[in-house]
């Protein structure tokens, strides 16, 4: 949720998420303490640049640690149960005493994001070519526009056979069919090998079926620390998901779909021409720029 706000809300002020792992009033409740430390973070202005604008982006403050929203993940239901995951770090400061920052993220955020609500087009193309309205006249996001993005996971020795046919990837094929019926803005995050983002041949074929039907696919690794390699894009037809974890890549793809819409669909999705493939690569490049900078 905090990462979603980080991408869409164009605020120049600090945006902080908190969680209480124990209920309010319970002995050892950490929620109240997290709120107090967040207030101290705001008052300290360590987040401000020379112009007084937020230079960090949305953060989560838990148990004295300041996490960037891009790289925080819940690992356990106890105090201290949030960890840095994805990226290379994630903890940028602490609030144990006076709030301090040790690092400032370079990823675009809040008022520097390319995906803020005030920059979204009123409509984008859906997978069937018809426009999908994204915001109303007041600039509010329409619930009906929220994209459907799911995660397909690679597991070693998981394929049914050694065929490179998509036929055995029944989960991905069923999701493609459901998206075509019900979700004009949709995509898939492919969580591949660690850290390279590779998948086996039949899964690759199924993911390309999604791409050729207008659904962008983002390749990430399951390791949570390394970058997906260039070869995971299958020649520029998939988006390389940087060093994002699969859940965060899902959030970024949802926001990007509201900005760019569906990929161009070939006349015959099972036999795209060279010109149609180039058109897909051109659209994927727009997504890639966002994933490289957010």
Model region roles, listed by residue range:
Residues 1-12, 199-207:
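Short Gly/Thr/Asp-enriched flexible loops that form oxyanion-binding sites at enzyme active sites
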Residues 7-11, 16, 28, 45-54, ...:
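Solvent-exposed alpha-helices and their adjacent loops that cap or buttress functional pockets
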Residues 16-19, 59-63, 153, 191, ...:
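Short beta-strand segments
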Residues 19-24, 64-66, 194, 223-225:
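Acidic, glycine-rich active-site loops and adjacent beta-strand->loop/helix elements
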Residues 24-72:
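Short, glycine-/small-residue-rich phosphate/pyrophosphate-handling segment
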Residues 30-36, 53, 171, 183, ...:
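Conserved active-site and cofactor/substrate-binding residues in soluble primary-metabolism enzymes
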Residues 68-195:
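Accessory alpha-helical/coil subdomains and C-terminal extensions
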Residues 176-181, 186-294:
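C-terminal non-catalytic interaction/assembly regions of soluble proteins
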């Amino acid at each position: 949720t905090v990462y979603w706000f980080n991408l869409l809300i164009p605020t120049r002020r600090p945006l902080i998420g908190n969680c209480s792992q124990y209920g309010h009033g319970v002995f050892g409740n950490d929620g109240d303490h997290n709120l107090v430390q967040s207030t101290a973070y705001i008052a300290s202005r360590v987040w401000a640049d020379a112009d007084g604008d937020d230079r960090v982006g949305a953060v989560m403050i838990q148990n004295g640690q300041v996490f960037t929203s891009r790289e925080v993940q819940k690992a356990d239901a106890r105090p201290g149960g949030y960890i840095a995951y994805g990226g290379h770090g994630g903890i940028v400061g602490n609030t144990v005493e006076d709030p301090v920052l040790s690092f400032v993220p370079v990823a675009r955020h809040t008022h520097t994001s390319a995906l803020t609500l005030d920059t979204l087009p009123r409509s984008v193309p859906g997978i069937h070519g018809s426009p999908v309205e994204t915001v109303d006249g007041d600039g509010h996001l329409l619930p009906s526009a929220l994209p459907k993005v799911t995660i397909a996971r690679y597991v070693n020795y998981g394929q049914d056979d050694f065929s490179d046919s998509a036929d055995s990837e029944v989960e991905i094929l069923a999701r493609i069919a459901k998206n075509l019926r019900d979700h004009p803005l949709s995509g898939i995050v492919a969580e591949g090998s660690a850290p390279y983002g590779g998948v086996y041949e039949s899964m690759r074929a199924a993911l390309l079926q999604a791409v050729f039907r207008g659904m962008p696919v983002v390749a990430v690794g399951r390791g949570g620390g390394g970058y997906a390699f260039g070869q995971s894009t299958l020649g520029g037809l998939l988006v390389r998901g940087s060093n994002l974890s699969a859940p965060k890549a899902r959030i970024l793809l949802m926001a990007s779909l509201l900005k760019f819409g569906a990929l161009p669909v070939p006349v015959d999705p099972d036999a795209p021409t060279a010109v149609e493939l180039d058109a897909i690569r051109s659209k994927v490049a727009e997504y890639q720029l966002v994933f490289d900078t957010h």
